[in-house]
């Protein structure tokens, strides 16, 4: 069976992606920092009839992330689809990054590690096997500030923009090698995420997940922006 690796898998979009691809015959490798989260996600996917296994790793710990993906490939044979959900560093308001006039090398570096360098590390871990097989899919998620500047999210937006440019270059560089690379920028609230602003209509994670399947199956576009 084919396998998808969900890096930085979460309880909303990550779970929906696992169900969406699992319903179409994929086994699911889940990578996240928390063993408790991994156990919860694998249990929910198992209840939905999806074969899943968790591999703990922090995306900012490059050796651990690469090792987790190697373990996932060993467990499932190989990784056919990679999804990297670029997490901003920090928690709460700090996870959104630093405002434009407050950006420094020191506060930009953690965003680059988590959003950009983690994605490169994950890609390098699975790409050789994809190249050898002549097929594969690389999917990446960032916030909309990677496409449209948002001054209050400057540092996260800078890291996301760097990742976005590389993804678009990957799409071109891999097109004749049987491998598809696609980018999704999410500029809306996902249903179930705490703290949604008043008046915002969140999008259901299952609906968003189906978009990723369509990108994987059709390979027709390199990028999709989900707006409010």
Regions inferred by a protein language model and the residue ranges of each:
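Canonical Rossmann dinucleotide-binding motif of NAD(H)/NADP(H)-dependent dehydrogenases/reductases
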Residues: 1-29
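Rossmann-fold scaffold of SDR-type NAD(P)-dependent oxidoreductases
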Residues: 7, 79-93, 115, 140, ...
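Conserved glycine-rich Rossmann-like NAD(P)H-binding loop of the short-chain dehydrogenase/reductase
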Residues: 26-40
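Rossmann-fold cofactor-recognition segment
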Residues: 45-63
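Hydrophobic positions on the long internal alpha-helix
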Residues: 68, 83, 111, 118, ...
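Conserved mid-core segment of classical short-chain dehydrogenase/reductases
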Residues: 87-106
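Catalytic loop of short-chain dehydrogenase/reductase
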Residues: 88, 105-107, 111, 115, ...
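C-terminal helical subdomain
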Residues: 168, 176-228
């Amino acid at each position: 069976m084919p396998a998808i690796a969900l890096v930085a898998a979460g309880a909303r979009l990550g779970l929906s992606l696992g169900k969406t691809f699992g319903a179409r015959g994929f086994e699911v490798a889940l990578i996240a920092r928390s063993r408790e989260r991994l156990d919860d996600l694998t249990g929910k996917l198992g209840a939905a009839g999806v074969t899943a296994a968790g591999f703990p790793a922090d995306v900012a710990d490059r050796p651990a992330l690469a090792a987790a993906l190697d373990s996932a490939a060993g467990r499932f044979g190989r990784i056919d689809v990679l999804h990297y959900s670029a997490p901003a560093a920090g928690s709460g308001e700090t996870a959104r990054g630093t405002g434009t006039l407050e950006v420094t090398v020191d506060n930009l570096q953690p965003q680059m590690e988590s959003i950009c360098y983690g994605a490169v590390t994950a890609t390098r871990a699975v790409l050789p096997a994809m190249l050898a097989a002549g097929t594969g899919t690389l999917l990446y998620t960032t916030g909309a500030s990677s496409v449209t500047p948002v001054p209050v999210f400057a540092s996260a937006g800078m890291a996301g923009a760097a990742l976005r440019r590389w993804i678009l270059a990957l799409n071109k560089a891999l097109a004749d090698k049987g491998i598809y690379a696609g980018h999704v920028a999410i500029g809306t609230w996902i249903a179930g995420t705490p703290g949604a602003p008043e008046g915002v209509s969140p999008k259901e994670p299952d609906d968003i997940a189906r978009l990723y399947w369509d990108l994987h199956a059709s390979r027709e576009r390199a990028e999709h922006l989900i707006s409010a």
